[in-house]
Regions:
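Extracytoplasmic/periplasmic ligand-capture domains
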Residues: 1-233
Length: 234
C-alpha cells in the first residue's frame, strides 16, 4: 500500500529473495509444496493458454496490465541464488535504487530501502529472519515485528503496515467474498481483507463475471483470469 511497495519492481525484488527452498529443507524437511496462486492444484488455477474470458478481459485492459499477466509464473524455470540476486538488483536499479556501501539507497535522495513485516505468530519470526539475512545481501533492511493478536488485528483493520504475514483460505466455488479480498471498493474500506490495496478494473470485472456466472465452465474461466491477474501483480 505504501512506499516502497507501491512500486512493482520493489515488490518483485524482495519476493525473489524469499528463501523458500532453504526454509523448506532446513525447517520443514522438504515437506512443503510451494504455491504460486490462490487456486493451485485445482481446475481454477491459471492455465498456460488464456481461455476466452481471460483473453477478452486482458485485451480490454491491455494498457493497464503488466506483460507478466500473459505469463504463468509457476512454469518459469527456477533460478539459482546468484541469478536471483542479479535479477533483484536489476529490478531495483530500474526503479531508481542502487547499492552503495552495502546499503540499497535511492538514487534521488540516498534514503535507505527498509521495510518491516508484522506477524502475530512467534514461530514465523525464525522464517522471517532468514529472509532478512537474504535481503541484507542486496542492502535491503527488513525488520521483523512480532505483535500480540489484538495489536495485529488493529494494524490489519487500519492498514497500518508495510507488509504482513497472512493466510487466505480459498473456496473452490468462489463468489462475493472475492470483492472483499481484491475488489476496488474494499481497497479503502477499513476492516476489509483487501490488505494489499488492490484497485484494478480488470480484477473487478473478473470478480463480476465470477459472481454472475450461470454455469461452472464460465466460473472456472473467470477464476482462472483472476488468478492470472493476481499473480501478475499489476
Amino acid at each position: 500500500r505504501r512506499t516502497p511497495f507501491d512500486d512493482i519492481n520493489v515488490r518483485k525484488a524482495v519476493s525473489l529473495l524469499f528463501p523458500y527452498d532453504f526454509i523448506n529443507k532446513i525447517l520443514f524437511h522438504n515437506l512443503l509444496s510451494r504455491t504460486h496462486g490462490p487456486w493451485d492444484n485445482s481446475n481454477l488455477q491459471a492455465t498456460e493458454q488464456p481461455n476466452p474470458t481471460s483473453f477478452s478481459i486482458i485485451s480490454k485492459y491491455k494498457d493497464q496490465i503488466s506483460l507478466e499477466a500473459l505469463k504463468i509464473i509457476n512454469i518459469n524455470k527456477p533460478l539459482n541464488n546468484r541469478a536471483l540476486v542479479k535479477k533483484a538488483l536489476n529490478l531495483l536499479n530500474e526503479s531508481g535504487w542502487k547499492l552503495e556501501n552495502n546499503k540499497m539507497v535511492s538514487k534521488k535522495n540516498k534514503k535507505k530501502l527498509t521495510f518491516s513485516v508484522i506477524t502475530n505468530q512467534a514461530r514465523m519470526e525464525k522464517l522471517l529472519l532468514v529472509w532478512a539475512q537474504q535481503l541484507e545481501k542486496i542492502g535491503v533492511d527488513l525488520r521483523v515485528r512480532v505483535t500480540d493478536s489484538s495489536q495485529f488485528q488493529y494494524r490489519l483493520q487500519s492498514f497500518d503496515f508495510d507488509s504482513i504475514v497472512f493466510k487466505y483460505h480459498m473456496s473452490l466455488s468462489p463468489g462475493n467474498e472475492q470483492y472483499i479480498y481484491w475488489g476496488n471498493w474494499a481497497a479503502s474500506q477499513s476492516g476489509s481483507r483487501n490488505y494489499a490495496g488492490i484497485n484494478h478494473p480488470a480484477i473487478d470485472e473478473s470478480i463480476n463475471v465470477i459472481v454472475n456466472s450461470k454455469n461452472r465452465d464460465k466460473l472456472i474461466e473467470a477464476t482462472q483470469t483472476l488468478d492470472i491477474l493476481l499473480r501478475a501483480g499489476k
